[in-house]
């Protein structure tokens, strides 16, 4: 595996692979890699000849009071995991390399509508930061395929919309959410949880499963299902952000006639924001 820090070196390395007819895959990450990230790299290897993983803690997608400064940076351990997974190129730019004029003066990529719902309502500038940096990575690497995890379901939908709207010749693939043995979705932020919070955290997925089962069994009172889940989260010590039952394609509120439904959930446990989702296919 080679490690590259500068855009011009990245482009030169990619160009060399292109001249050999290689199919390029991209896995964008913010580092602190876990088994979920590694599974995306392995998926990229199955689909492509040459895999590029980026590690960049993107300041543009963090709000003013969020965890940019304390976000875990574990580059040496990340490199070991990537080498073991068979990754070919690691791109780890400095902030000054990607945002030479600073964040305020940098051109932004905005996906109206979809990016304003759910997580976007709570974190207004978050998805603008995501789509901006991902579009930059797409332009630098020009991959044939890019792979994102399904745990960040809304992010995946936003990136698909951006790719479609801008006519980018990139196939967006997704990898399934990997979970701990007790059901908690793997996340780089799980390390923030105290031992007691870690015991409580799996309730979020348990409620998603129970709510999905209710819907599969014919319960279409989505508002009541959401209200009950939020109430149980609150009683357990969470501060719910949302527990929304949506159309899987549009992410707008689900209606009883929808056949593909996703339940999106976000809640704070202490200062840690956990997100998760589950999909329901009816008929």
UniProtKB/Swiss-Prot annotation:
Listed Pfam families: Pantoate_ligase (PF02569)
GO biological process: pantothenate biosynthetic process
Enzyme category, top tier: ligase
Subcellular location: Cytoplasm
InterPro entries hit by this protein: Cyt_trans-like, Pantoate_ligase, Pantoate_ligase_C, Rossmann-like_a/b/a_fold
Pathway(s) annotated for this protein in UniProt: Cofactor biosynthesis; (R)-pantothenate biosynthesis; (R)-pantothenate from (R)-pantoate and beta-alanine: step 1/1
Active-site positions on this chain: 37 (proton donor)
Coiled-coil portions: none
Entry annotated with the keyword Cytoplasm: yes
Keyword Lipoprotein recorded: no
More info: The reaction proceeds by a bi uni uni bi ping pong mechanism.
Summary of subunit composition and partner proteins: Homodimer.
Protein name as catalogued: Pantothenate synthetase
Source lineage: Bacteria, Pseudomonadati, Pseudomonadota, Gammaproteobacteria, Oceanospirillales
Gene: panC
């Amino acid at each position: 595996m080679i490690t590259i820090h500068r855009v011009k070196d990245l482009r030169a390395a990619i160009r060399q692979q292109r001249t050999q007819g290689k199919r390029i895959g991209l896995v964008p990450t913010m580092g602190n890699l876990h088994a979920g990230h590694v599974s995306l790299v392995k998926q990229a290897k199955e689909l492509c000849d040459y895999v590029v993983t980026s590690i960049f803690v993107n300041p543009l997608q963090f709000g003013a009071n969020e965890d940019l400064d304390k976000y875990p940076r574990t580059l040496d351990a990340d490199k070991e995991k990537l080498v073991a997974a068979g990754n070919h190129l690691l791109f780890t730019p400095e902030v000054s390399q990607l945002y030479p004029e600073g964040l305020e003066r940098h051109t932004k990529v905005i996906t109206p509508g979809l990016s304003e719902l759910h997580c976007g309502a709570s974190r207004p500038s978050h998805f603008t930061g995501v789509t901006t940096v991902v579009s930059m990575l797409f332009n630098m690497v020009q991959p044939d395929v890019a792979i994102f995890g399904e745990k960040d379901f809304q992010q995946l939908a936003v990136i698909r919309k951006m790719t479609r709207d801008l006519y980018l010749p990139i196939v967006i693939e997704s990898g399934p959410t990997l979970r701990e043995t007790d059901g908690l979705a793997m996340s780089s932020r799980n390390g923030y949880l105290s031992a007691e919070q870690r015991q409580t955290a799996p309730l979020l997925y348990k409620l998603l499963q129970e709510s999905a089962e209710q819907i599969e069994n014919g319960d279409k009172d989505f508002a009541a299902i959401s209200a009950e889940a939020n109430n149980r989260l609150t009683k357990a010590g969470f501060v719910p952000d949302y527990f929304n039952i949506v159309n899987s394609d549009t992410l707008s509120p689900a209606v009883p006639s929808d056949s593909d439904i996703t339940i999106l959930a976000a809640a704070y446990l202490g200062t840690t924001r956990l997100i998760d989702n589950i999909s329901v296919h009816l008929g």
